[in-house]
Amino acid sequence: MSRAKVGINGFGRIGRLVLRAAFLKNTVDVVSVNDPFIDLEYMVYMIKRDSTHGTFPGEVSTENGKLKVNGKLISVHCERDPANIPWDKDGAEYVVESTGVFTTIDKAQAHIKNNRAKKVIISAPSADAPMFVVGVNENSYEKSMSVVSNASCTTNCLAPLAKVIHDKFEIVEGLMTTVHSFTATQKVVDGPSSKLWRDGRGAMQNIIPASTGAAKAVGKVIPALNGKLTGMAFRVPTPDVSVVDLTCRLGKGASYEEIKAAVKAAASGPLKGILEYTEDEVVSSDFVGSTSSSIFDAKAGISLNNNFVKLVSWYDNEFGYSCRVVDLITHMHKVDHA
C-alpha cells in the first residue's frame, strides 16, 4: 500500500514536531509545508534547532526552493488563505491544520476547496469536527469524514487511562487537574489577555489556574463517560511535559495494586505505545521526547479506599501529541484505501 502524503499548515511548535515525528515514525511522507510568516531559510534553522527537543537527528538543507530533509524534498508555500495553498500540486491528500486558527469544519474545509486536499486533521480540539484519540476510538473513523480533530494533548493523555479504569472498574464520576507546561499562547512577562485576566500574567513567574475542556472532551471519545468528568489546569513554569491528576470514584471496588495491575496489562497489551507504565522515581524532564500519549506513574497515585482514587499520568504535551497526529493519519489512510 502507498503511504499517506501529508501537508502541514502552520509551522509552529506542533507543525515542526509533526514533521519530526513523521521522519521518526516513517509511516507517512510530508510533501508540503505552508506558513506565511516563515521563509525557507528560517524553516531550515527552526527544524535544525529546538530549545526543548535538541538538534534534529538528520540532514536539513534547501534545494531548488524546497526543503530537503534526510534527502526528501518538501515544497514550501507562504499563503494566508487555506483555499489558495496548492496542496494538489504536491500530491498532499492529508493536511495537518496546526495554525490554531482554522479549527471548525467550515474553516478547515478551505483546504479541500477546489479539490486541493482530501482530508484535514486539526491538531487541536474542535467545536464540531469528529474527535479521535488513537488507542481509544480511532476505529470509529469512517472514510466519509473529511475533517477530523486529534483532540488535545491532555485529552490524549487522559482518555487512554480513563478507558482502562472505566472498562475494568467503572468510573462513576471524576475530576481532572492537569499541571501543564507553559505554551506560546502565554506571556513571557505580564501583559493584557484577551480571555481571563490571569492568563496574561508572566508564564515563567507564576503558577496560573486556567480552564481546560480536556476532561469533558473524554466524553466525546468515550460516550459512557459523557457528563462524568470535568477538570481544570494549572499552567506552570516548565517549557515541556505535563501531568494529569485524575481523582475518581469507582463503581467496582479495587485496591490500588489491582488498579496498577490493570494499567500495566493494558500498557504491555492493547495500548502498547500509547499508554506506558512506570514504577521509577520519575520527574517531568524524564519525559521530554516521549512518544507515548500517557505514562502512568504507579508510585505517585494514592487511594483513600477501594472506591476513591487519585491516579497520575505524565505526557510530553508537544512530541507525544505530534506522534499521535502521525498515527491518526496513518490509520485514516489505511481505512481510506481499504
Curated annotation (Swiss-Prot):
GO cellular component: cytosol; membrane
Gene3D superfamilies named in the record: Dihydrodipicolinate Reductase, domain 2 (3.30.360.10), NAD(P)-binding Rossmann-like Domain (3.40.50.720)
Subunit structure: Homotetramer.
Chain positions of site Activates thiol group during catalysis: 180
Lyase listed as a keyword: no
EC code: 1.2.1.12
Protein's cellular compartments: Tegument membrane
One of the record's GO molecular function terms: NAD binding
Keyword annotations from UniProtKB, A to Z: Glycolysis, Membrane, NAD, Oxidoreductase
Pfam families: Gp_dh_C, Gp_dh_N
CDD domains linked: GAPDH_I_C, GAPDH_I_N
Family recorded in the similarity comment: Belongs to the glyceraldehyde-3-phosphate dehydrogenase family.
Protein name: Glyceraldehyde-3-phosphate dehydrogenase
Active site annotation, chain numbering: 153 (nucleophile)
Protein role: This antigen is associated with human resistance to schistosomiasis.
Catalytic activity entry: D-glyceraldehyde 3-phosphate + phosphate + NAD(+) = (2R)-3-phospho-glyceroyl phosphate + NADH + H(+)
Any Gene Ontology biological process: glycolytic process
Coiled-coil segments on the chain, per record: none
SUPFAM superfamilies: Glyceraldehyde-3-phosphate dehydrogenase-like, C-terminal domain (SSF55347), NAD(P)-binding Rossmann-fold domains (SSF51735)
Pathway membership: Carbohydrate degradation; glycolysis; pyruvate from D-glyceraldehyde 3-phosphate: step 1/5
Protein residues bound to NAD(+): 13-14, 35, 80, 123, 317
InterPro entries, sorted: GlycerAld/Erythrose_P_DH, GlycerAld_3-P_DH_AS, GlycerAld_3-P_DH_cat, GlycerAld_3-P_DH_NAD(P)-bd, Glyceraldehyde-3-P_DH_1, NAD(P)-bd_dom_sf
Binding residues for D-glyceraldehyde 3-phosphate: 152-154, 183, 198, 212-213, 235
Main location: membrane
